[in-house]
A protein has these predicted regions:
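Non-catalytic accessory regions flanking glycosidase/transglycosidase catalytic cores in CAZymes
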Residues: 22-260, 266-280, 324-327, 331-342, ...
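Active-site His/acidic residue clusters
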Residues: 217, 289-314
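Aromatic-lined glycan-binding groove of carbohydrate-active enzymes
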Residues: 281-290, 295, 371
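Amphipathic, small/basic residue-rich leader segments at the start of a protein or domain
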Residues: 283, 314-315
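Active-site and adjacent substrate-binding regions of carbohydrate-active enzymes
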Residues: 318-319
Length: 525
């Protein structure tokens, strides 16, 4: 790095830290000179549709409204933790085929990876027939997936221009007499997908294999069993789906982040990936939840995050700590592969109630920026439209605040990650090449100060898109002062920016995207 460039980035960091204008001796930073850090996947920002949404079943229950009686805990379920009764509620299958609003909202997020998985996918039975499905799941399974439901998934992914990512059934029903994974269900699902004109782009064998029986795996499932199953999985892929990428291991709840009961016998990623025969993956994956929601507080009394800490640096920085932990494992066990976060959200167990508000949008965008700089290739938000952490409200099918931040990210942030300097103070800055504009640069500026505006000076003319809300707990947001809303058909309004040049005053508690189409950054050509 040249001395001049160090001074330039230092000036930008100082502006971010102080939020005040520096003297004339300090020139504005030039986005055209931001250096390339790394490249991410062109479909970096992705999302999950839980298998339980597709088939219907018991998913995370809504929080009681004021005045409603809270359900009493009942033992059983998640590793014997006494929270089962308050955790789940029956939900009907999502309408991926006929819900025009949902399809239009998803399409606005751009072509991207769509992952259909989750713990419920581990024990789903694919009824590969046009005859009526069984009234109850076959032995060893917990739910039934019909051809019509899967056809809806494939059609949805086609409609939004996505790449389909899945995991396969691995419960007792999907195993032979000796307990080894049987690829028959995977083979059938893949064949039917191809028959429909679809394609499974990538697959994890198991959703969260380190969680064992908590996620539907046989009791006593260990690293040796995982290695054995992964060998069968690779043989299946090579023979039946040679273009499909193997993703894994897909672990969660490590690096000091407690999101599962301590008594379930978690199998560390180190053990999973070092067992013989050594599991081989094309893409290394993990899940990141910085904590658990109130639904699962009984798992660990020290877990959870209060809403007044939502904008704190130590909360946001957990993403870096987790990424560092898993990048070390990637280098050790799958060097040279891309790394994906195949699930992430505000908190595990459906998210806290405030995950649905403006308050969590800061984490959403900050995490995308941090993990891109860390070299994570794809980040799958959990979920598109289920529970409190969803981008879209499952009851109204209307966008939540983070959805609008996601749309602007999809439209503006390209796949070349740039160095906008180190975050300092309450203003966090992340930059990537401007999508679809050779030489252009996009910058997102997150003002975490809830009381004071921040100042930012960058050279060149830009178009600015500033998101704000009336308060942190708002369920709606404004773009450059105008409230954002969609029609009943889910078609988005025209998201118009405003001209920006020179020193910019960024409102308190705001997220601003700035597009510099004429930056002439050589890394972006």
């Amino acid at each position: 790095m040249t001395k001049g460039r160090m001074l330039m980035l230092g000036s930008l960091s100082l502006l971010a830290m102080t939020g005040v204008t520096l003297g004339a001796a300090t020139p504005p930073a030039d986005p055209g000179r931001f250096a390339q850090v790394v490249k991410v996947d062109d479909q970096y920002q992705a999302y999950n549709v839980e298998m339980v949404e597709v088939v219907g079943g018991r998913f995370w229950a809504p929080y009681p409204k004021p005045g409603e009686a809270r359900p009493q805990p009942a033992a059983g379920g998640s590793g014997g933790v006494d929270i089962a009764a308050v955790m789940f509620r029956k939900r009907e299958p999502i309408d991926l085929t006929g819900d025009t609003r949902l399809r239009n909202l998803a399409r606005a997020l751009g072509p991207t990876h769509v992952r259909v998985s989750g713990g419920w996918a581990n024990a789903v039975y694919f009824h590969d027939s046009d005859t009526p499905p069984p009234a109850t799941p076959p032995r060893g399974y917990q739910s039934v997936l019909t051809r019509a439901q899967w056809a809806g998934v494939v059609d949805f992914v086609k409609t939004v221009g996505g790449k389909l990512v899945v995991s396969f059934p691995v419960s007792d029903g999907a195993r032979d007499a000796s307990g080894v994974w049987d690829p028959d269900q995977a083979r059938r699902l893949n064949a039917y997908t191809e028959k429909l004109g679809g394609h499974i782009y990538a697959a994890e064998l198991i959703n969260e294999p380190n969680a064992g029986s908590m996620v539907g795996l046989p009791k006593g499932y260990d690293a040796a069993a995982f290695a054995r199953d992964m060998a069968v999985f690779r043989a299946f892929r090579d023979a039946d789906a040679p273009q499909m990428k193997i993703v894994g291991p897909g672990s969660t709840g490590e690096a000091g982040f407690v999101i599962m009961p301590r008594n379930i016998g978690v199998v560390p990623t180190d053990a999973l990936m070092s067992a013989e025969p050594r599991p081989r993956v094309d893409i290394f994956s993990y899940h990141f939840y910085g904590t658990v929601s109130k639904r699962c507080a009984a798992m660990d009394k020290s877990a959870g995050i209060s809403p007044d800490r939502a904008l704190d640096e130590d909360w946001l920085a957990r993403a870096d700590l987790n990424a560092t932990y898993y990048k070390e494992r990637q280098q050790r066990f799958a060097s040279g592969t891309d790394i994906w976060i195949t699930e992430t959200a505000q908190a595990a167990c459906g998210g806290d109630a405030w995950a649905a508000t403006w308050r969590d949008s800061f984490r959403y965008v900050d995490q995308l920026g941090r993990q891109a700089k860390q070299g994570v290739s794809v980040v799958f938000h959990n979920t598109l439209a289920a529970s409190d952490y969803a981008l879209i409200d499952e009851a109204t099918m209307m966008p939540r605040p983070s959805y609008w931040a996601a749309v602007l990210w999809a439209r503006l942030m390209g796949n070349v990650v740039l160095d906008a300097g180190q975050n300092a103070g309450k203003l966090h800055l992340y930059s990537q090449c401007l999508r679809g504009t050779p030489g252009g640069v996009a910058l997102v500026a997150i003002n975490l100060d809830t009381a004071n505006p921040a100042s930012l000076s960058l050279a060149g003319k830009a178009t600015r898109y500033t998101l704000t809300a009336d308060n942190l707990d708002a369920g709606s947001v404004k773009l450059n002062g105008q409230t954002l809303a969609v029609g009943q058909d889910g078609v988005l309004p025209n998201l118009k920016g405003v001209a920006a040049h020179g020193m910019q005053s960024l409102p308190a508690a705001s997220i601003s995207y700035l597009a510099y189409p004429d930056a002439r950054n050589p890394a972006c050509r």
